[in-house]
Amino acid sequence: MQRNAVILAAGKGTRMKSNKYKVLHKVAGKSMVEHVLTNVKNAGVNQIVTIVGHGAEDVKETLGNQSLYSYQEEQLGTAHAVKMANEHLKEVEGTTLVVCGDTPLITAHTLQKLIEHHESTHAQATVLSATAQIPFGYGRIVRDEQRRLQRIVEEKDASEAQKALTEISSGIFAFDNRVLFSKLEEVKNDNAQGEYYLPDVISLILAENGVAEVYHTDDFNEIMGVNDRVMLSNAEKALQQRINIEHMRNGVTIIDPTTTFIGPDVKIGMDTIIEPGVRINGETVIGEEAVIGQYSEINNSHIGSQVDIKQSVINDSIVGDKTKVGPFAQLRPGSNLGSDVKVGNFVEVKKADLKDGAKVSHLSYIGDAEIGERTNIGCGSITVNYDGVNKFKTVVGKDAFIGCNTNLVAPVTVGDGVLIAAGSTITDNVPNESLALARARQITKEGYLKK
């Protein structure tokens, strides 16, 4: 059966008090609408239409070709928003899911269960509900004496008795697609807000003795909407807790989950230890038995097994097995460290390959370079890669020893087994098994200060 989805992402989000479009605010490193779209796709939906309004181009840039788009010029209510998808879905068969773009905690599992319940009961509409301790602001689920859905009433239209109900509508629905777009034509705006409410489609279905169902989730957090910065913070905490718990149950030790921030797409191997204050984002993959030291930050990188990282920043890089990084090192984009490499304190690496066993232990900059196996780069050594206009490459062979405070002025190639004397500035290529010394001769004038 064809499964479609409409993501509602056209609201202004004025309570966020931000120049940024509401659904583009991030939770756990990804925009809210990206979370929603990912989980909708993972629930088995074939075609997605996102309703955009304010900030439409920014949303399109974020989601790209993962979705079709319809534009809602005026925000006249949720039914009006869904109606904008007419151009893509009106003649389509199957089930259509309607999800708010500001519900980043909804899971693919719950959406899938909602769809399955809807289809198995042959319902024309199904609403996802939850029980709220404080239901203020949510539409209430009103049931009859047989516990069947009677209607959904919005907060501002509810009686005092209805406001006392604690089962609330999530704003997430599954519909028979043809029924949905047929009934949208009949929805009126005769309510306190003067808006076209999507839940009124359910009232229209029930008025004709159609089948409307409720699927209840036990996790209220899943349907949490985000309307201001306080709610954004609450969503961040809830999602981060969920992510951390999942990693811990998969065999990862997280010393202090309350100060550890891990993105939703991160993968971490068993017996890895994450110390307090760590941030791991993007599509980072970490192997087994690694130690990620406190206050480290890793973004979109591949970290091997048994790696030890201490208080360092790693971006868009690869770190091989048994390699040590830090403390206070930085791997900038394009860094590729092999196995058993050492990048020590206050070392910066950028767009460089360090082969297996290479060591850069202290206070060095290695940029646009290739460093061979087992080569040692002495303290304070620099690859001089930039002439003010262009970047040039430095190549150092295997088993070389680069003395302290050496400048390698690119483009330059240093061969295998070379020894560079400390304090040298190397501007010419050095052949294999050579000694290179490039510094001024020391002059000592004894007794000079006594004159």
Curated annotation (Swiss-Prot):
Homotrimer. Pathway: Nucleotide-sugar biosynthesis; UDP-N-acetyl-alpha-D-glucosamine biosynthesis; N-acetyl-alpha-D-glucosamine 1-phosphate from alpha-D-glucosamine 6-phosphate (route II): step 2/2; Nucleotide-sugar biosynthesis; UDP-N-acetyl-alpha-D-glucosamine biosynthesis; UDP-N-acetyl-alpha-D-glucosamine from N-acetyl-alpha-D-glucosamine 1-phosphate: step 1/1; Bacterial outer membrane biogenesis; LPS lipid A biosynthesis. In the N-terminal section; belongs to the N-acetylglucosamine-1-phosphate uridyltransferase family. In the C-terminal section; belongs to the transferase hexapeptide repeat family. GO terms for biological process: cell morphogenesis; cell wall organization; lipid A biosynthetic process; peptidoglycan biosynthetic process; regulation of cell shape; UDP-N-acetylglucosamine biosynthetic process. Its EC number is 2.7.7.23, 2.3.1.157. It comes from the Bacteria. The keyword Acyltransferase applies. This is Bifunctional protein GlmU. The gene is glmU. Its cofactor is Mg(2+). GO terms for molecular function: glucosamine-1-phosphate N-acetyltransferase activity; magnesium ion binding; UDP-N-acetylglucosamine diphosphorylase activity. Acetyl-CoA binds at N385, Y386, A422, R439. Residues 1-229 are annotated as: Pyrophosphorylase. Gene3D superfamilies: Hexapeptide repeat proteins, Spore Coat Polysaccharide Biosynthesis Protein SpsA, Chain A. It is found in: Cytoplasm. It holds the Pfam family Hexapep. PANTHER family: BIFUNCTIONAL PROTEIN GLMU, NUCLEOTIDYL TRANSFERASE. SUPFAM superfamilies: Nucleotide-diphospho-sugar transferases, Trimeric LpxA-like enzymes. Transmembrane segments: none annotated. The active site is at H362. One of its GO terms (cellular component) is cytoplasm. CDD domains: GT2_GlmU_N_bac, LbH_GlmU_C. Mg(2+) binds at D102, N227. UDP-N-acetyl-alpha-D-glucosamine binds at residues 8-11, 22, 72, 77-78, 139, 154, 227, 332, 350, 365, 376.
